[in-house]
């Protein structure tokens, strides 16, 4: 049994963590604002509010005068003036002054109120008149600032990879317009909006991509509180898109002459079943090379071929020649001799086996540990020991040098290198390999940037205490400040995360399927057949049903998980989710409609955690993406995302920091339960650069159809594994016969498990891998909108940990969108009136749904600065239909609460941390 439990007093993060740092300091976007226009808008709105109070008072006083007067001309004049005041319409000066004189003779108090309103309304009219010129001048200056930002080296380096088309337009865009203050034409405005989105992405968001966002390796240490300092100068690393290598390999294999020289092997893990040969067949669906982000989709399935004399003899040959190189051409010649058949027939037969994956060419695959994929590909070619392969490897030398020079090159040099790289890859395919039309992906390179933290921290293993830093370059976080701010609330919230884990129902279902087949304490030695039967008999149909399931129906009632096996653990999960929703609903109702914040207490979390008892694995290392809001007197830490797994924050960046993989490898020993080992599930050949990483586990599981990347002694074949149910612990245990130890599968890539082939995906149901998006408002009624059509959600926090940011939701029809004929200053003023009326902060992230927008922009939160007309215009361009709905979320932390600095200024940053997991004792 496991030693329980989550010790809330000692839980902390592992001393090594990652910091994701926005590429531009936040000060860079301040120049895009119109501060004087904002002050003008505030003054207008303040004066308007005061005038409304005066107008109400004056209206009442005039009402009394009208009712008490028999002078019909005076009554008509007073009625007209009262209507003007009610409609906030400034009357003509002469007529208003005459009426004011008459009122003064009748009621001095009313005259005083009326005089104040007229004076204020005339002053407001003058102030309103100043808005157009002021806004136009400041908008012009903000456009100049945007043009200046368009030349920022860090922005342009990333932009060249993210949007080459936009990058190519920016030099012309940066030139001053022919006439100062002229409104840009339609094409220029489109460029402006696209550029603005990338500027905000680089200054205000933290998703690593090239130099848009850098990463720094951090450690617990020092005594600087929550303040982090990163380096001003960044270093980058570029790698060729592995899809480009896949296209090269396809071209080599497609050429009969070169194919003859390629070593071949049967699909690993194949076996004989009576009159059939069984193996895992893998299908690869090529991605679209013309899209910016593409990778080849892979699926696998247990497959059978009818045994025949020819196939049996061929497989026997492979067995007899095990450990020696068998080339495709040699195999064709052997078949011709053995069968007495024509070479063409033998080519056709072997080609068919290649097509169905029974025979494979493994040497040209990119594997997860090929952290320099192009150099690895060259090495594989030279290992063929054939003149054409050496020549092809030599032809790839110039593209390889382009890749190596790219990271340190200027933006102009990068353009030339990309052009040379693309031309070189095309030439290799067309000139060297004879391809009619070269296949080269649109995105040729992927790049990551280090924002410091390259020095080795003293200890990368788990534990709450810090180790002294060995170099000043390491980003350091004060452990005492972290413990006080986040350790306890984060540990408490971790206890309820299984309720939100998207993979937990699948893990419970797989265990239920196993128990139905093998019973309590049962054992399965044929995992390949188990996985095949699970998918064939149950899981594929189950996934079809769950894909259409909505967690809550139209009435807000929770919809239970699909539970065809009648599993009590799934019912317990449903109960925990209902409990969470009921407690959140009660919390919301108690807070009232105007609440800005609600607090989840310990009792709330304890009640939900009690329902989850025994559902989650006892070995559950977690990773969290967090942002610190360093507010005076009330600092907060915001939980953005949570994942389960080992070394997840680091794996993608191991090649960026010297020695990081070795330190992480060593650190895992302290978190693995006694009697268990970690073994990586790779998912097979790499189809995305996101899956490249150094070695982080002592072992790897080699699935059928894979060849493995480690030395033989560290490979665990599927045949060596068996699955057994531990009735005492109530869990499934994967064990290795050779090692006589429990094996914990670990996935270190960045693709979602659903994108992996069937067999690795199923093995991960036995791993700590999880995805737990914390949607605290799921199933909680929104409540009625306010008079302006806006509904709100308060911020949700547990202690200093924010679980959900404050938000506002509105249909497009409720927004003060720019309408034909409206003035720019009037439109700007309307937005600030809207913001003020509904209590929105100055800066938010806006998510537009149901827009029909294409690409990532339509789905992701966009930074919106209400003080910038350029930002407002770019946001409005995302709203394509009247049916669109917008959710505004507070920018937390906002720019006044940022805790990460460099010599350039303050930076938006996000911490990627792993929570420390004490060693748990197990007996099986």
Whereabouts are the PLM-identified features?
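C-terminal structured domains
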Residues: 627-881, 886-890, 910-914
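Acidic, low-complexity/disordered tracts enriched in E/D and polar residues
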Residues: 2-12, 196-321
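Short, positively charged loop/turn segments that connect secondary-structure elements
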Residues: 336-345
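Type-3 copper protein
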Residues: 1-238, 344-685, 857-924
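Short, Φ-rich (hydrophobic/aromatic) sequence segments
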Residues: 152, 159-257, 744-806, 810-813, ...
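Elongated alpha-helical scaffolds
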Residues: 306-309, 326-327, 344-348
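Segments forming glycine/polar-rich beta-alpha architectures that bind adenosine-containing cofactors
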Residues: 244, 248, 253, 258-268, ...
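Short acidic, hydrophobic short linear motifs in intrinsically disordered regions
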Residues: 323-335
